[in-house]
Each structure stands twice: as C-alpha cells, then as structure tokens.
Amino acid sequence: MGFTLAIVGRPNVGKSTLFNRLVGRKLALVDDLPGVTRDRRIHDAKLYDLKFQLIDTAGLEEAANDSLEARMRAQTEAAISEADAVLFVIDAKAGITPADSTFAEAVRRSGKPVVLVANKAEARGSEAGMYDAFQLGLGEPCPISAEHGQGMPDLRDAIVELLGEERVFAEERQEEAADEVFTPAAVGALVGDDIEDPDAEEIPAYDATKPLRIAIVGRPNAGKSTLINTMLGEDRLLTGPEAGITRDSISADWEWHGRKIKLFDTAGMRRKARVQEKLEKLSVADGLRAIRFAEVVIIVLDATIPFEKQDLQIADLIIREGRAPVIAFNKWDLIEDRQMVLADLYEKTARLLPQVRGLRAVPISGERGQGIDKLMENVVKTHEIWNRRISTGRLNRWLEGVIAHQPPPAVSGRRLKVKYMTQVKTRPPGFVVSCSRPDAMPQSYVRYLINGLRETFDMPGVPIRLSLRTSDNPFAGRAKKKK
C-alpha cells in the first residue's frame, strides 16, 4: 500500500465504524460503550480509487501512566508516529469536548498532516458541532456519516488534497508504468463494480485522478444516453425510442478542452407509482446513488414536453442532496419558434425552482451535437460556484450592511439580534449565523439572507445552506479558557 492513515479521536466518536467502512468488512468491534477498541488494528483499506494502510486506535484517554487507559493512549501515539497522516474524528452531534481540544493539541504537536473528520453529521444539531470544530485549529471539518456512508467522496478529496496526488497515487502510477495496460471495458464499468466496502451498492466508484463528476439524469427517453454518445463521439450506450433502455448507471471517462470528466448516465427516473419491476426499482436506486456521488448533475428535459411533475421532483431531489444542478433543454432541433419558447422556459425555470435562483439552463440537441460546449461552460462555472469559499471578514462586513438596511424583525416584542456569520463548508456552500433566539427567526428572513448571499457573492444556481445557532462567536470559548 502506498501510504498509511491513522484514525484518532476520543472514545465513542465512531472511529471503528469508519474503520469498518474503509476496510470493507466488520473487523473492528463497534459498540456505544466507550473504550471498546483497546489495541490498534492495521488493515488494507480502500476509498474509491485510494488504496492505503489504515490504523484503528483506542479512544484517546487522559489517564495515569500505569493504567489500562494510559497503555491504550500509548498505542494511539504509536499509531500517529507510524502514519503518514491522521484522520482526527469528532462527534459533530455531541460537539467539541475538553477531551477533543486536549488531544487535538497532541495531534498538532506530532506535526503529522491532519484531516478533521466530523462524524455523525447526519444527526440533527450537527451543524453547531461542525461550527465549533474550527476552534480545534485543524482546518475545515469534513462532514461524514460513517454509519450511513455519507460524505465519503468529500473525505476522499480531503485526503488527496492533504497528501497530494503524487503521493497518494505513487504506487498506482508505478504499476501502470510497469504494465502499460489499458482496458477500455473499465471505462464503461457499472457504478460500484470495484468497491469493497460493506455497503458497496450504496456508494458509486470514483475513478482516475479527481475528474469533474457529472451525473446525467431525467425522465425516461429524455435523450440522456444520446447526449453522452455525442459527447464521447461514439455509440457507447444503447439508445432508442423505447423508454427505459438504460438499466444501470453507466460511467465513462471524457475530456473536454483539457478538463477530465467522469460522466454517469442513469436509468430514467419515473414516479414511484410507475416503478413496478424489481429490476427497474434497482435501476432507479442506482441512479439516486449516482446523483449522490456526482458533483454536478445535468437534468435533461425534453424541450417538447418540459417541466412535468417528475422533472420537478428530480430537480428537488438533486437540490436536497446538495448537488450543483444544470438544466439541458434537449431535442432543441425539434423546436420551431425557438426565441419565444426559450424565453418561456427561462421564466418557468425561475418560477418553478426558486430555491436555486439563477439556475443555469441551456438549449441543446444531443442527437446533432448542438449546444454541448455552451452546456459544459455552464457546468464548469456552476462547479466553481459550488466550491466557492468566502472569507469570514467579507461575510461579516456584508452582514453588518444587511442588518443596517433590513434588521431582523421583533418577535414577541423583542428584537432578534444577528451577531456573526461564517462559512463552515463548501460543496455546496454552507453558512452558520450566530444570533439570539434562533428558533424565533422567521424563515422569510433566512431566505432574505440566502438571497443576499447569492446576489452579493455571485452564487447563482447552487444550493446554499444556512443554519442558525446561539453563540457570540466561535472564539468565545477559547478566550474564557485563557483566563
């Protein structure tokens, strides 16, 4: 294996659950009782295209030197010294504890590169824990759910960014140079074929060296496979007038103007009432997994019959999953009064999908290859916005002006106070606002803030997450500790 990672953290934050997921089987004992893991375990692990050695450690414990807990801590410290990098795991649901802060300091002193992993991020209230995690000084937290397999693509990207592509793919590239073998069949592999984790059917494969991952979705017979065939310049995918030809999520590598792309064609997504065959149910589920794995999702609409109920349900699903959507109005060659029809489609896009104001939409003909460059320009731009980070200073200068112009309303005779804002994640952009009485804040004012962020910082067409919490600022706790 090319490199070694150590999973480190206080007891009961989910280290062994993450270990089991990455090694592909339940090798580590998992229980709610702290201290279940007493020794460090080392095993070959895989996260999409990353192959490495993984060390599971006992929960870090503060203890007397002659105690069992002290020996467990020694095992953990040995694991840190052996590893190339550390996955420091916290419980986002429980928030930051004094033990987290103590052992984060120990990890920093080791000098090893660190990915801060915010586990249990699917739980209600986890946003506050991720917000507090910045005080550990270990960088931006990577939110995941080890139990449910959520956030694994982001964890993979964080590891590559931390160690660098040359380091993490060194062994793989050496093998490729020695073998000089390329198998075209692998390009069209079914999503999830080469995954060995315990829920392989839930997590699609991630191929190559960080290409832009695009899923192409839509109702049956909207022209998804035809579009991909035109992009690739070959008949890679079966197409025809019959709805539902594509049964699986098919992946294909592509390069557009020097940019590496991973395309996923998905089975047509029907209404639940019409999904009757077991195979088709599995195909739709596979399409949902492709959406969750993708970064940008192209929603292919038949321009002759656009915006049916199912189209809007698909778009809503993509937005709720936090992906970056782009609409392709396909079969544009069949439209006669194009200027009038396009104006009508733009108006419907804005009216029917207000939750992603500024959603990019492009007319294309997948069969004739028209509009594909324009579509891809919008895909790349949307991907850049989806990854955008705004400094805390800029955010709070903007927030000060917003409050001066339109302060929050008074509720029950008391004015709500908005104190502080910071960005806690990207992909999609996520923000936390510190305020008094978050539960009393009207959703209309939250939407007002989101729309202001979108307009001021030029973030059209992507989901924006905004959470409220009670706290003066993220450094208040740190200041108190120094006294």
UniProtKB/Swiss-Prot annotation:
<protein>
    <recommendedName>
        <fullName>GTPase Der</fullName>
    </recommendedName>
</protein>
<dbReference type="GO" id="GO:0042254">
    <property type="term" value="P:ribosome biogenesis"/>
</dbReference>
<keyword id="KW-0547">Nucleotide-binding</keyword>
<comment type="function">
    <text>GTPase that plays an essential role in the late steps of ribosome biogenesis.</text>
</comment>
<dbReference type="Pfam" id="PF01926">
    <property type="entry name" value="MMR_HSR1"/>
</dbReference>
<feature type="domain" description="KH-like">
    <location>
        <begin position="388"/>
        <end position="472"/>
    </location>
</feature>
<dbReference type="GO" id="GO:0005525">
    <property type="term" value="F:GTP binding"/>
</dbReference>
<dbReference type="InterPro" id="IPR006073">
    <property type="entry name" value="GTP-bd"/>
</dbReference>
<feature type="binding site">
    <location>
        <begin position="265"/>
        <end position="269"/>
    </location>
    <ligand>
        <name>GTP 2</name>
    </ligand>
</feature>
<dbReference type="InterPro" id="IPR015946">
    <property type="entry name" value="KH_dom-like_a/b"/>
</dbReference>
<feature type="binding site">
    <location>
        <begin position="9"/>
        <end position="16"/>
    </location>
    <ligand>
        <name>GTP 1</name>
    </ligand>
</feature>
<dbReference type="InterPro" id="IPR031166">
    <property type="entry name" value="G_ENGA"/>
</dbReference>
<feature type="binding site">
    <location>
        <begin position="119"/>
        <end position="122"/>
    </location>
    <ligand>
        <name>GTP 1</name>
    </ligand>
</feature>
<feature type="binding site">
    <location>
        <begin position="218"/>
        <end position="225"/>
    </location>
    <ligand>
        <name>GTP 2</name>
    </ligand>
</feature>
<dbReference type="InterPro" id="IPR005225">
    <property type="entry name" value="Small_GTP-bd"/>
</dbReference>
<keyword id="KW-0677">Repeat</keyword>
<feature type="domain" description="EngA-type G 2">
    <location>
        <begin position="212"/>
        <end position="387"/>
    </location>
</feature>
<feature type="binding site">
    <location>
        <begin position="330"/>
        <end position="333"/>
    </location>
    <ligand>
        <name>GTP 2</name>
    </ligand>
</feature>
<keyword id="KW-0690">Ribosome biogenesis</keyword>
<feature type="domain" description="EngA-type G 1">
    <location>
        <begin position="3"/>
        <end position="167"/>
    </location>
</feature>
<dbReference type="InterPro" id="IPR016484">
    <property type="entry name" value="GTPase_Der"/>
</dbReference>
<dbReference type="InterPro" id="IPR027417">
    <property type="entry name" value="P-loop_NTPase"/>
</dbReference>
<comment type="subunit">
    <text>Associates with the 50S ribosomal subunit.</text>
</comment>
<comment type="similarity">
    <text>Belongs to the TRAFAC class TrmE-Era-EngA-EngB-Septin-like GTPase superfamily. EngA (Der) GTPase family.</text>
</comment>
<dbReference type="InterPro" id="IPR032859">
    <property type="entry name" value="KH_dom-like"/>
</dbReference>
<keyword id="KW-0342">GTP-binding</keyword>
<dbReference type="Pfam" id="PF14714">
    <property type="entry name" value="KH_dom-like"/>
</dbReference>
<feature type="binding site">
    <location>
        <begin position="56"/>
        <end position="60"/>
    </location>
    <ligand>
        <name>GTP 1</name>
    </ligand>
</feature>
